[in-house]
Amino acid sequence: MNYTLLYIRDISEAASTIPCRETLRGKKIFITGANGLICSAVVDMLMTINDEDHAGISIFIATRNMSKTIQRFGKRCEREDITLVNYDATQPFHADIKPDYIIHGASAADPKAIMEHPTATIKSNIQGLSILLDIATKQNSRLLYISSSEIYGIKEGGEPLSENDYGYIDILNPRSCYPSAKRTAETMCVSYTKEYATDTVIVRPGHIYGPTMTDSDSRASSQFPRDLIAGKDIVMKSEGLQQRSYCYVADCASAILSVLIKGERGEAYNISNKNSIVSIRQMAESFAQAAHKQVVFSTASKSEKVSFNMMSNSSLTSSKIESLGWRALTDMPTGAEHTLNILRNSQ
């Protein structure tokens, strides 16, 4: 990734909202999923905190694809505060690391990959977390699990969902492999907390977007900006009336670190920007307007339809995480503009 001045500024400004970030000083933080949309930004934010505060945070990037990690972070992999660790979520893990914090973000989240590999989606979520929970228990580490707003399922009404609002999931639909695995993983976390006093905390991100998405990410909020950068209009395969909680990736990273520091043991926290609860269509229009392009409509194929998120409303409340002192900075129009500007200057 090309670290543009705008991206660096976005990360720095979002990091300024983290309450009590001095708590991270001198800590060892082990992060999975750092090649992906969310946790790559978390790594960038931790490096920024080190640069700004001389915080001495040791960042361990767990990866099963070293070349992809090096491609993502470039020469930053050579920094003294960065250590790359071979890691596969489905295999036993042994490393001479005693982390203070574990951030577990490794998970299939791409809708196309989920539908093509539902079994692997379940296994990687459950097996990977089980291994890390054992490490957290043994090493007395705090483990933050990155779950998903999809755990809420389908629920009547259009009000934003709070952390206790649970709806219906069709467990015989293979597309449910992802939310079902995430639900099970959350229960594993609180079960370890109950039985072994393991220090766990959970975040449930809404729909996260930004310039750190991977090339293979087929989610609409990643595909749309890629198409615009290629000079294409946005093609929507539905009316786009579903309500979503969108959150710019820099705000999501600061939310994760805020919960890591101040979240209550055994609790779950939504990650949502209350100023970016919009429909998929409105999200598409924000990106199109920023690029001076159009939103056009087409009919989805059968294979495309089966990968769709079935929730008509996955908007989330943010009051619980805001009670920790966190706040989002970037609304949807600004986030769309920044995403496109950063991607253009990264080519």
Task: List each language-model region with its residue ranges.
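Mid/C-terminal beta-alpha module of Rossmann-like enzyme folds, strongest
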Residues: K262-K305
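Conserved Rossmann-fold NAD(P)-dependent oxidoreductase catalytic core, especially the SDR/UDP-sugar
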Residues: H104, S130-S176
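Conserved C-terminal active-site "lid" loop/helix of NAD(P)H-dependent oxidoreductases
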Residues: V249, S279-Q282, E304-A328
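Active-site Tyr-X1-5-Lys
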Residues: L172-V201, I229
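N-terminal Rossmann/SDR dinucleotide-binding element
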Residues: M1-Y101
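Glycine/proline-rich active-site loop of Rossmann-fold NAD(P)-dependent oxidoreductases
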Residues: R183, D199, G210-Q223, K232, ...
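NAD(P)H-binding glycine-rich loop region in Rossmannoid oxidoreductase-like domains
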Residues: N86-S124
